[in-house]
Structure formats: structure tokens, C-alpha cells
Amino acid sequence: MNYLEFHRQWRPLGCFNVQQIYSWCPDFNRHNLRVWEQKGYITKLRKEYYAFSECKTIPDFNRYIANRIYRPSYISLHTALSYYGMIPEAVVQITSVTSLKTSSFKNDFGEYSYNSVKPGLMFGYEPKTMTDGRAILFATPEKALLDLLYLNPFYKTENDMADLRLDEDFMCEDFNGEIFKEYGERTGSKALNSRIKTLLTAYGL
């Protein structure tokens, strides 16, 4: 198999793994991947996962990869909060939530961290459409903030919540406090729900 044939097959997907390749072509010569990587045609994302190097120029493709290389997962926490304009900081690392074990990866597309939660907490996310039509799973604003509190129990007092520096205009105009509380109730955690109330009080909601 030559590279042009391979490219024609997998370019619409953008990134792919070795298992997918063998499902398509059982006699595929895996050595080709090493050769194409050395030539700069493809980039290794993590063990057995690759993307076409040309995809680096596609807006938001680095976020799309986050959903693909560690599944199930969705983008949440600081990356999602920054995406919605809820926090002032620019976020370099792409942060996600997963029901798998906590993990992280670094490749030419970026740095990726995955924080583990219970399978029952894998809710509150929705697809966001990229410029080229691909979908990226993002936590809703309310779930991104809930995930942050769940994974960082040291946020306890009103002062702690104020230290998050959440955008007050967003919190007053766009953040849905009722959904936030409903999400909290779904966790079944009294301690977390208490901290949710503290955060809402801190931001006058």
C-alpha cells in the first residue's frame, strides 16, 4: 500500500489508530507508519494513535484529538471554562474528564490531561461543531464548573470560590444556577452540594 492510498482512506477522519487500520486492511505493513512518521507525513499522538501532520493547520483540530485518543472523554475543567469566557486565564493544556484512569499525553498537537470521575458522572456535555464540521464533546458551563469542584475539594469557602475569578457578567447572565444545582444533586454527594451552594452565594446567585 502506498501513502496516497492510505491518505485517501483516512484523511476524512484526520486521526486514527492501529486497530482501525487493521480492521480496514488486515495485511497492512505496520512499518509504513514508522516510515511515514519519519518523513513527517503523520504524527504520533500516543501509543498506536496517529494524525496527519497537515491537520495542525486546521482550527480546533487539537481539541478534536482530545476526544479521540482517550475514550470515553469530553473536554471540561479549565479548557471548557476558558472556552466559555468564564475564567480570565489562557489555558495551554487541554483538560478533559474521563471514566477511565487519570492520564496525560503530550504530542506535536498539544498537551492533554484526563481526570478520572465515576462513570455515573459522565453527563452534562454536548457537541460543539468545528469550522470543518467535525464535532467536539464539551462540558456545558455548569458541568465544567461542577467537575472542577468535584475534582478539587479544597475549594470550600466563599473566599476560595472568589479565588476562581469567574467572570461575573457570565455568571449573572449566562450561567444557569438551577441546572448547576440539578447536576450536583445527581452526584449524590452532600459535601459537593454544600460547596455548590457556597459558590452560588459567593457570586450572588
PLM regions and their residue ranges:
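Nucleic-acid-binding surface
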Residues: 20, 53-205
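Short beta-edge/loop segments at beta->alpha junctions of small alpha/beta modules
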Residues: 1-72, 108
